[in-house]
């Protein structure tokens, strides 16, 4: 079982492990393993995973697709260091960027996709974090069992979009946002919130409204929205 911890509660060794592993992922091949993950996220013509780019289908796939995306990335991390994990940025409580990440400079050579040309991305941020979602808003969402899945994912994706925009810079560009290591911590927090809502017995059985073909989480066929429904089954939790 992998235990994902808050980015603000990592030991110095855990901080260094995360940075060392993603650096190793970004120095292996051409394109690097890290850049390949960025390319998957950017290829939204084939991998609808957001309401912004995929309409109703993308909105329904947003949470399960990114859950699988993070799991695949974390698995790749653990092939380099079995003790590695993706920390989460609890932005409604820790209303600042993780300080140990601030001095870390990162550059990714992003491969071309059908929608983007190849580019060199030097990660930058322009944080204006006063408007981050609040603890009260997130607590209300996590405990709101009156919502159906469509309502829940719509609200959570909206909060997610707000965080991307308030961090700014690389995170503010949906096509290249995974170049910023903060992306993984942000989406781990989104996934953590989702897992809390899913754990409420009143929400059991609430699932994305998708046809069988759209329920397949490409490019990871045969993964589907149902095979990633439980983080316990997937082998990780949030602590």
Where are these regions (language model features)?
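C-terminal accessory segments of proteins
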Residues: 1-239
């Amino acid at each position: 079982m992998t235990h994902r911890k808050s980015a603000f509660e990592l030991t110095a060794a855990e901080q260094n492990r995360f940075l060392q592993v993603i650096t190793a992922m970004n120095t292996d091949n051409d394109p690097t393993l890290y850049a390949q993950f960025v390319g998957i996220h950017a290829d939204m013509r084939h991998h609808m995973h957001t309401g912004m780019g995929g309409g109703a289908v993308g909105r329904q796939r947003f949470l399960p697709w990114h859950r699988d995306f993070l799991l695949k990335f974390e698995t790749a991390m653990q092939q380099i260091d079995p003790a590695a994990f993706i920390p989460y940025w609890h932005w409604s409580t820790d209303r600042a960027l993780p300080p140990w990440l601030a001095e870390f400079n990162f550059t990714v050579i992003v491969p071309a996709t059908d929608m983007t040309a190849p580019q060199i991305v030097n990660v930058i941020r322009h944080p204006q974090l006063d408007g981050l979602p609040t603890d009260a808003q997130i607590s209300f969402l996590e405990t709101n069992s009156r919502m159906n899945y469509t309502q829940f994912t719509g609200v959570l994706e909206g909060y997610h979009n707000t965080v991307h925009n308030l961090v700014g810079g690389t995170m503010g560009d949906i096509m290249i946002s995974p170049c910023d290591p903060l992306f993984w911590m942000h989406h781990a927090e989104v996934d953590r919130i989702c897992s809390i809502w899913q754990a409420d017995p009143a929400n059991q059985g609430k699932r994305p409204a998708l046809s069988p073909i759209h329920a397949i989480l490409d490019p990871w066929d045969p993964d589907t929205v149902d095979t990633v429904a439980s983080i316990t089954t997937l082998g990780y939790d949030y602590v």
